[in-house]
Swiss-Prot record:
Binding site for a divalent metal cation: D9, E10, D101
Disulfide feature: none
Keywords attached to this entry: Cytoplasm, Endonuclease, Hydrolase, Manganese, Metal-binding, Nuclease
Subcellular location: Cytoplasm
Thylakoid is among the record's keywords: no
Cofactor list: Mn(2+); Mg(2+)
Function: Endonuclease that specifically degrades the RNA of RNA-DNA hybrids.
Organism (species): Neisseria meningitidis serogroup A / serotype 4A (strain DSM 15465 / Z2491)
Identification of the protein by name: Ribonuclease HII
One GO CC term, this protein: cytoplasm
Family: Belongs to the RNase HII family.
Enzyme class: hydrolase
Cofactor notes: Manganese or magnesium. Binds 1 divalent metal ion per monomer in the absence of substrate. May bind a second metal ion after substrate binding.
């Protein structure tokens, strides 16, 4: 008998702005999607196409997030674990086993779970979750770029690139910026001195 297995992965731990996203995906036993691998190894166009196919074919899937305020109050690791738990809790079908990318398991899942280092390249359910989390994170950055085009979020996706750091200095810190991340925190501290 097929065991209902969910894969869980996150996207957006490193950027200076926005939420950290997590996805949980249960795939059918017969699922086959050529080219599905760790989302970081895929082009954006390929990720977007795969995301639609995953959503259409999955037994269940759910994407969840933890916002900048939660990241600031909990720290990025605990906020990531919270987003992962929300993703699992949001599944319409309860899995019998969960595989989580990385080396940590969120608390209180109440389902047998296993952390798998580099799982997004080893386990297809985690690869699928990786794609859904990354496309959701990118969508947040495109929406933010619409509201604040001068920051270039559509290009750097919120990471601490030269363009982003220059925009931070020139235009200031947005409510969506992660105030506990060093480049943002340091800029706010400098501004407080003047």
């Amino acid at each position: 008998m097929h065991i209902l297995t969910a894969g869980v992965d996150e996207a957006g731990r490193g950027p200076l702005v926005g939420s950290v996203f997590a996805a949980a995906v249960i795939l059918p036993e017969t699922f086959d999607l050529p080219g599905l691998t760790d989302s970081k190894k895929l082009s954006e166009k390929k990720r977007d196409a795969l995301a639609e196919m995953i959503k259409n074919q999955a037994v269940a899937w759910h994407v969840a997030a933890a916002g900048p305020e939660e990241i600031a109050s909990l720290n990025i690791l605990h906020a990531t674990m919270l987003a992962m738990k929300r993703a699992v809790d949001g599944l319409a079908v309860r899995p019998e086993k969960i595989f989580i990318d990385g080396n940590r398991i969120p608390e209180h899942l109440n389902i047998p779970a296993e952390a798998v280092v580099k799982g997004d390249s080893k386990i297809i359910e985690i690869s699928a979750a990786s794609v859904l989390a990354k496309t959701a994170r990118d969508a947040e950055m495109y929406a933010l770029a619409q509201r604040h085009p001068q920051y270039g979020f559509d290009k750097h996706k919120g990471y601490g690139t030269k363009q982003h750091l220059e925009a931070l200095e020139k235009y200031g810190v947005l409510p969506e910026h992660r105030r506990d991340f060093a480049p943002v925190r340091n800029l706010l501290a400098q501004q407080a001195l003047f």
